[in-house]
Regions:
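Hydrophobic alpha-helical transmembrane segments of multi-pass inner membrane proteins, especially
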Residues: 1-94, 133-194
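Ser/Thr-centric signal marking residues that sit
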Residues: 29, 128, 199
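Extracytosolic (periplasmic/ER-lumenal) interhelical loops and adjacent juxtamembrane/interface segments
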Residues: 92-113
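Long extracytoplasmic/lumenal interhelical loops at the membrane interface
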Residues: 106-142, 169
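Transmembrane alpha-helices of multi-pass inner-membrane enzymes
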Residues: 194-201
């Protein structure tokens, strides 16, 4: 079982990475990097009282971060999540176009490279951040289900390899990769359907 100093050092290292990335500024990616760095710490046996302490500390600093550290466009991303129709041609444009693309795909989609939202450049970063919207529009629900099945198979294989590993290091490393991969999938999907603010992943 790791010592308390090991958890502290790892947390500091993850926070330094978060700070450097967030200064770009890229707060979303910085948070993802921090969480990804903390996943192995949790899997190594981080006590629940420490996790609770992290959460309490996060709740305490959130008002200060919102008022003093977040840039205006970052605050607007959060506010847009609550009411994307308030500025449909400005801050709400990305999520509105994304939801339109997803909803218009239907069961089978409009066909490969035949999506109007994606091919006419209504969707920003359609090749990366909003690729889920493009797949939903062009391949429909069937394409999305096929994608989830493929993702599920990859994640299942990762955790199966972790289960078969002989050392704790191998198990923690493999399981961490599986959880980080799952984290990126969830963030991307939840972002494009409007459940969490838009971040680049």
């Amino acid at each position: 079982r790791p010592r308390m100093s090991d958890w502290f050092i790892t947390t500091i290292a993850a926070f330094i990475c978060f700070y450097l990335v967030s200064r770009q500024p890229d707060l979303g990616t910085g948070l993802i990097v921090f969480v990804s760095g903390m996943i192995p710490v949790y899997l190594a046996g981080l006590p629940y009282r420490i996790i609770l302490g992290y959460l309490v500390g996060l709740a305490m600093v959130t008002p200060y971060v919102w008022s003093n550290l977040l840039l205006e466009y970052q605050r607007q991303r959060v506010l847009t999540l609550l009411n994307p129709e308030a500025d449909p041609l400005g801050t709400g444009w990305n999520i509105n176009q994304s939801q339109t693309a997803i909803g218009s795909g239907g069961l089978t989609g409009k066909g490969y490279l035949s999506g109007t939202q994606s091919q006419l450049d209504f969707i920003p970063e359609s090749h990366s951040d909003f690729i889920f919207s493009v797949i939903a529009e062009e391949l429909g629900l069937i394409g999305i289900l096929a994608m989830f099945i493929l993702y599920g198979f990859i994640i299942w294989r990762i955790f199966r390899i972790s289960y078969q590993s002989e050392t704790n290091f191998e198990r923690i490393t493999c399981s961490s990769l599986g959880f980080i991969f799952l984290l990126f999938i969830l963030i991307n999907v939840l972002m494009v359907i409007g459940i969490i603010p838009v971040v680049g992943v």
